[in-house]
Amino acid sequence: MQFSYSWLKTQANPDLSADKLEHLLTMAGLEVEEIDTAAPAFSGVVVAEVKSVEKHPDADRLNVTQVDAGTGELVQIVCGAPNVKPGIKVPCSLPVAVLPGNFKIKPTKMRGVPSNGMLCSTNELGLPDDGVDGLHILPEDAPVGTNIREYLDLDDMLFTLKITPNRADCLSVKGIAREVSALTQCAFTPVEIQTAPIGSEKKQAVRIDAPADCGRFISRVIENVNAKAATPDWMKQRLERSGIRSISALVDIGNYVMLEIGQPMHVFDADKLSGSLIVRRAQNGETLACLNEKTVTLADNTLVVADEKGALSLAGLMGGAASAVSDGTQNIVLEAAWFEPEIIVGKSRQYGFGSDSSFRFERGVDYRLQADAIERATELVLQICGGAAGEMVEAQGKLPEAKQVGLRLGRLKTVLGVDIPAEQVETILQHLGLQPEKTAEGFRITAPSFRFDIEIEADLIEEIGRVYGYENIPDDYTSGRLKMSELPETRRPRFAVYNEMAARGYREVISYAFVDEQWELDFAANAAPIRLQNPLAAQYAVMRSTLIGGLVEILQNNLNRKQNRVRVFEIACVFGKGSDGRFVQNERIGGLWYGAAMPEQWGEKTRNADFYDIKADVENLLKNKAVEFVKTGHPALHPGRAANIVSDGKVIGFVGELHPKWLQKYDLPQAPLVFEIDMAAVLECGKTRYRAVSKFQPVRRDLAFVMPEVMNHDDLLLVLKGAANKLVQEISVFDVYRGTGLPEGMKSVAVKVILQDMENTLTDEAVEPLIGKLIGVATEAGARLRS
């Protein structure tokens, strides 16, 4: 939102410098992005009247002028502007003047003729281009000799505010003035809306066919206007200083009313309309040529203003070229409406262009402002373009209901930490236009139509706090007893997991929770993911149920940057639906390892990481839990190199190598290794229990079993561990042999058994029966002792 200080002062005139007002607005939540003067620095330029013009004797394109600059005598100036003529008043820079860019004016001779100054265009003064080829022509009543900065108010300060989406009421000079009045207690004097005299019987019928999308729609016919009338300089100046280019009087009036009171408007050429103006949803495939010279194909989620023949404008966004006013326009229809913000939001992105109107409508416009806007625009049209106004015609749809909100003074003190007198609170609320009513506990207000953001008590407390001034709330350091937070013995701290992963060489990454729907099919076989109603983009249309897709994408990015050894992990939530249909989110840790097992070095032979490398990382991560790895099938993983991670009979995650079919699809030179585990299980750990170290030597026995290839060694270990007693400290596989000496379809699995007693040295008499028992249960399971 951009505006000039001089315009603001017509509605609220605080006794503050521009710099102090900038600070005040910013501290109140209306951030001032930029403040600047209306024109760059220059001096020595005055209003002058051209008295005579003669051709230069030695130059066809130059003229010798005599100028009255208020010095008491005529000044001779040689000028090359094509529009110079006697009687006009123009800016004149006299000798000793300094123009923008430190350009100094001195007496000189031009083709032998003395010239004692320069007549100026807008460009030479650093002003916005007025579209004139030549000198900047001033009004006839401009006083000769007056400093041009003073006459054109060029020391006026321009404010650019960054208005937050909840404060659409501040997207007008009136809204800013209301805020300044509340902040400084100066008088708030908004423009007085005059009721226009009715001089025409013509009316423009209106109809709302989408009442949920349009709450109010008002029209007024004005006949016999002069569309070629010039926009007054005061209006041009205010528009230009608000960042809007002057186009024509009728268009400028609509823009001016929008900036002045906050209601976007549209002006139709009445003679180009056919029947009623109708607010409706567009028909799929309907087209509209817009004022920006773009033709758009409309979707049925778009609101349009139409007549009996078809769409005339994109409601709240942009008018159509077919019904636009031009220099030949004689009769116009003024239109003002209130549109539900939700129907306007996203349309700028959908159609590839926006406007000042859409910026306001999608944030919310005062739903009681439309009639005032029509009256104000009518007043300006009659004043500038003439004509005769007809009566307003109004149609209503569904309008918002005013909300009542209570404010407890006790709660106000608790939240802000300062005791603000009730009288001061009441004054602040009144200056904000909230019209408070006293209650036993404080005040009750009915949210005004221009404040969509006032919904709960906290909103009122915020208003009081920012107007009272956060800087006026004294510092009060929190005091109290400090107590260390207690972490249960059965739960490890989160940072320990991060440190563990970093120690293993993994780097933490963060990816979007919104993912490509295809990832869900590929990596989770999830054909019914949770869909987003308004996705950021097509490739972010669903919520993830696994972390694998994001990790693979990060791997691709690293490979594109020639990083051939990648180890990353992410701790984040995944999303799904429970058995009752409700959304469920669970936190998981996912990891990916790609490339060499070790960094390249002279002392270690280079090899790619395999399943057992990443399994070791998982075992280290879960070292405080008893876990098993059970062969499984998973849509993301290689069918022979995938395992579920099981703890206490419950699957808590999976680990394995990415399925070969995804390597080509995702352009990966080799298969990465991945894992994903429930974070709750990772943080869980058993209580640490003391156990004395045995003073007696352990005994090792190595057993080699011949077993069918189809038999899993985990099954063998499970049988052996089930038959073991307290003397057995460890049973594990240390070798697998296939080849000569074994029948076809058989393999030899070597198992080490570690035995140790806490009280005695083990003897063969104690060990051999147990070993025999282990051999027996293995034989029953289908594995015979290798001879």
From Swiss-Prot:
It comes from Neisseria gonorrhoeae (strain ATCC 700825 / FA 1090). Binds 2 magnesium ions per tetramer. This is Phenylalanine--tRNA ligase beta subunit. It holds the Pfam family tRNA_synthFbeta. Its EC number is 6.1.1.20. GO terms for molecular function: ATP binding; magnesium ion binding; phenylalanine-tRNA ligase activity; tRNA binding. One of its GO terms (biological process) is phenylalanyl-tRNA aminoacylation. Its cofactor is Mg(2+). It catalyses: tRNA(Phe) + L-phenylalanine + ATP = L-phenylalanyl-tRNA(Phe) + AMP + diphosphate + H(+). SMART domains: B3_4, B5, FDX-ACB. Tetramer of two alpha and two beta subunits. Signal peptide: none annotated. Residues 694-786 form the FDX-ACB domain. It is found in: Cytoplasm. Residues 400-475 form the B5 domain. PANTHER family: PHENYLALANINE--TRNA LIGASE BETA SUBUNIT, PHENYLALANYL-TRNA SYNTHETASE BETA CHAIN AND LEUCINE-RICH REPEAT-CONTAINING PROTEIN 47. Residues 39-149 form the tRNA-binding domain. Mg(2+) binds at D453, D459, E462, E463. It is an enzyme of class 6 (ligase). GO terms for cellular component: phenylalanine-tRNA ligase complex. It comes from the Bacteria.
